[in-house]
């Protein structure tokens, strides 16, 4: 009997000795030489890898440390890269007892120096689109085997519709003709979520484009072709949360990888109220709930206070800049992530890419609060977000309220716009604030209507004021919709983006008369705006509303653009003496678009 136990014990020891040790994934999949930060974090994932020792033998690369996490299927490997390390491939050797596993890793040369990456600014006009809803250029990737259950159904506004990167690439000439200079896509990374997650805001792989949109190489190719047309690409990223189907939830690296990790038994949702950031009397309870609560059950809240989570996210953003040559970042749900971590990320990014730009989604409608988030704001001192561009939800709120009012009294109609810009004294850099009249999370500016004069007036203001303007796909053809039914009704398919569509608004012949009028208006204004230093760099002078008219001027190096907006339903007369300091002795100006009716705008070059 003793012999049986001895044999059994020996067998168990043998099985333990040769238990599996696998590496399924290493993030990032490769890295670049010449980065300012010499530290490189590798997140190694595979069965039983957590107990392994690691060695590396490559000139200029040394092992700094390894970090074992609570799950035995993760191992964090920290390498130090010398300043003069050469591009090349080398082996990472993992050993545990008699077990040995070798994985090849590569360091690549950077395509250009960090200072050569130029971001977007006030000279640009951004065009926001949802890849799933713009155009389907490759129907073969609509259904991908092995992904979480989903359907492609264009009759369901909340399902996937099949749009992809190929569809965007095939219509780059459309954007060139329209005159936009930058495209911002909603997130394109893998969202392997039940139902399809067409919007892209529930990431399940930070290093992989969703195969229903295309591949990493196709994304890179699209950007190269956009650059050939002088069109920039802004990448939508999310540091605040990931998707619940991410491997980090299925096999949690550690309990502190997420905030409130016991979501199945004790779900904590964010309050969605961002006031604790600025409230001098806020309670810790309110601050924690806002910052650490989950958006929804399908979007786990990442803990950026964990230094390993932080480093993973920072490296990921740098990797996409280097790999795909993206021209800017739009950071989703910016204030919901840890403030100090985001500030440090921005500091690192600005040091590595000094001419780059990132816009943070700061959804607050008070100018003081929006300004609090901008880099070098005195309002947040001694803190500093280091975030160069914030989103002007105050402008969005005011223009969408003003459109339903007559400009007859103070604080009504266009007087709201005048007062909104009064608060520009709060911003360290008003010209680096991103303005918009609608986006993928709001009602369309037209609602369910088709008031073209109102749209023209708002768009004239958007494209000529002291801001970085952002348009939303389809506005140029008067796409409308409201969110009351669901988000899908403000994210409709672009007509003509699918083979067999009844209409094709991508061509003049496929648009109605009023759609062509709207498109031509945008085309004229956007192309006039390109390379216009008065718009990109000019100062601004605004006038109090007179007789329902709001007027302002942009000035730069002796050139002036003068804009007058009539905020009433009737023709109105305003004595030019009000604007004498701008008009001076000018006998005439050049009106690039002549529009003389109620609720319109006149632009004059002096």
What do the PLM-derived regions correspond to, one by one?
Residues 134-323, 342-352, 368-369, 382, ...:
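Substrate-binding/active-site clefts of carbohydrate-active enzymes
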Residues 20-51, 103, 107-111, 117:
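Beta-strand/beta-sandwich contexts
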Residues 223, 241, 246, 318, ...:
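Active-site-proximal helices and loops of the catalytic beta/alpha 8
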Residues 36-98:
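Immunoglobulin-like IPT/TIG beta-sandwich domains and homologous Ig-like subdomains
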Residues 427-450:
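Active-site clefts of carbohydrate-active enzymes
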Residues 7-16:
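Bacterial N-terminal signal peptides
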Residues 125-127, 183-185, 233-235, 329, ...:
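Hydrophobic faces of well-ordered beta-strands that scaffold small-molecule active sites
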Residues 5, 19, 99-101, 108-125, ...:
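Carbohydrate-interacting/catalytic domains
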């Amino acid at each position: 009997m003793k012999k049986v136990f001895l044999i059994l014990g020996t067998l168990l020891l043998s099985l333990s000795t040769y238990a599996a040790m696998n590496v399924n994934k290493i993030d990032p999949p490769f890295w670049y030489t010449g980065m300012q930060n010499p530290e490189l974090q590798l997140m190694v994932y595979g069965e039983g890898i957590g107990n392994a020792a690691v060695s590396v033998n490559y000139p200029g690369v040394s092992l700094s440390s390894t970090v074992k996490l609570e799950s035995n299927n993760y191992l964090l490997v920290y390498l130090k890269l010398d300043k003069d390390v050469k591009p090349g491939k080398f082996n990472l050797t993992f050993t545990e007892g008699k077990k040995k596993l070798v994985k090849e890793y590569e360091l690549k040369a950077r395509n250009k120096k960090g200072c050569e990456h130029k971001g977007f600014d006030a000279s640009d006009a951004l065009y926001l689109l949802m890849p799933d809803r713009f155009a389907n250029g490759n129907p073969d990737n609509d259904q991908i085997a092995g992904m979480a259950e989903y359907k492609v159904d264009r009759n369901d506004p909340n399902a996937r519709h099949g749009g992809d990167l190929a569809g965007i690439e095939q219509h780059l000439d459309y954007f060139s003709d329209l005159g936009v200079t930058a495209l911002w896509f909603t997130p394109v990374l893998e969202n392997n979520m039940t139902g399809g997650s067409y919007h892209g805001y529930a990431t399940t792989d930070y290093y992989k484009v969703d195969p229903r949109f295309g591949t990493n190489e196709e994304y890179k190719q699209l950007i190269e072709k956009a650059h050939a047309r002088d069109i920039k690409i802004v990448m939508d990223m999310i540091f605040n949360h990931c998707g619940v189907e991410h491997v980090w939830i299925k096999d949690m690296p550690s309990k502190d990888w997420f905030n409130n990790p016991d979501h199945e038994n004790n779900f904590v949702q964010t309050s969605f109220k961002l006031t604790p950031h600025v409230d001098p009397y806020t309670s810790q309870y309110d601050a924690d709930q806002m910052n650490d609560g989950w958006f929804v059950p399908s979007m786990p809240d990442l803990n950026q206070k964990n230094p390993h989570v932080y480093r993973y996210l920072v490296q990921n953003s740098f990797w996409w800049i280097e790999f795909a040559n993206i021209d800017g970042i739009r950071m989703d749900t910016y204030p919901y992530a840890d403030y100090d971590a985001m500030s440090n990320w921005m500091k690192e990014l600005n040091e590595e890419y000094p001419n780059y730009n990132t816009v943070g989604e700061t959804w607050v409608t008070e100018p003081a609060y929006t300004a609090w988030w901008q880099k070098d704001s005195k309002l947040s001192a001694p803190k500093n977000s280091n975030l160069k561009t914030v989103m002007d939800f105050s402008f969005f709120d005011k223009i969408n309220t003003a459109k339903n009012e007559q400009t007859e009294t103070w604080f009504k109609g266009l007087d709201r716009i005048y007062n909104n810009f009064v608060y520009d004294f709060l911003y360290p850099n008003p010209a680096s604030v991103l303005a918009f009249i609608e986006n993928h999370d709001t009602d369309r500016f037209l609602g369910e209507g088709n008031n073209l004069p109102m749209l023209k007036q708002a768009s004239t203001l958007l494209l000529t004021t002291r801001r970085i303007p952002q348009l939303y796909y389809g506005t140029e053809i008067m796409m409308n919709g409201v969110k009351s039914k669901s988000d899908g009704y403000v994210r409709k398919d672009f007509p003509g983006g699918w083979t067999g569509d009844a209409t094709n608004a991508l061509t003049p012949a496929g648009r109605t008369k009023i759609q062509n009028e709207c498109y031509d208006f945008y085309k004229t204004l956007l192309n006039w705006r390109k390379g216009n230093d008065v718009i990109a760099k000019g100062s601004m002078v605004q006038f109090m509303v007179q007789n329902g008219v709001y007027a302002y001027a942009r000035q730069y190096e002796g050139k002036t653009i003068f804009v007058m907006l009539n905020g009433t339903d009737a023709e109105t007369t305003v004595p030019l003496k009000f604007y004498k300091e701008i008009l001076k002795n000018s006998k005439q100006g050049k009106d690039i678009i002549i529009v003389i009716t109620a609720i319109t705008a006149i632009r004059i070059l002096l």
